[in-house]
Amino acid sequence: MSDAEHADATQARFAASVERMVEHEQSRREELRAQVRRFLEPTGDERVLDVGAGTGGFAFAVAPLVKEVVAVDVVPEVLAAGRARAEQEFPNVTFVEADAASLPFQDGGFDLAAAVRTLHHVSRPELVVAELCRSIGMRGRVLVIDQIAPVDPLVGFELDRFERARDPSHTRLLPDTDIRSLLDANGLVLRRSEQYQEARDVDGYLDLAGCAGDERERALSIAPENYTATIGWYLAARQPV
């Protein structure tokens, strides 16, 4: 799939899943906020960039803990849903349409730049991480949260095959070592990391992606048994000069 075809697939799938995304994110907002508060220990003065924000799951979770959030996505439908919620509940959250690999912001304008469950949806994750790094100031931090590829590459290959059947916008899961290498390549030092297991009901997981009809049958035929995903959290900062 070319970059243009992948971009079209991403927009189509997320545009069709807006209501399900909003409902899912609202159901876990308080849990995510508690995780963010513990992991980031925000001061309340941060200006935060959320790249690949979707309808605002992370943006709205972190908003009460910081000064300002700028949420970026490429899908107009999810941006519209996010803006509507921001106007009602979170005046310190702004939604901007932009490409995660080419952000329209000046260097060093944010205290924290985050990519939350975003990297497995992009064809060039190294460009996105480079943009996150460019966007933070000298004392800024980068947060990456994503599902981690299994250590066994054959298991990872089969898992990516299922994920693409479920959601054509999926590219590939990155191994833990790749995420660490991307941060290191941009001059960042990993300050904190952790992993946890997330059990997934396959039927509900397919529903969330709007996977139906023949697509659903194919995805079910290759779905992992007792699907448990490994989720990694990575917090990095610039190396001291």
Feature annotation, model-predicted:
Residues M1-G44, G57-A61, A81, L143-A165, D203-D207:
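Conserved class I S-adenosyl-L-methionine
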Residues R117-T118:
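Short catalytic micro-motifs in class I SAM-dependent methyltransferases
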Residues R28, N186-V241:
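Conserved Class I S-adenosyl-L-methionine
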Residues E126-M138:
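A short glycine-rich, Lys/Arg-flanked "PGG" loop and its adjoining helix->strand segment in the class I
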Residues R172-N186:
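Short alpha-helix
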Residues L49, T55-S102:
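Class I SAM-dependent methyltransferase SAM/SAH-binding core
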Residues A114:
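A conserved beta-strand element that flanks and buttresses the S-adenosyl-L-methionine
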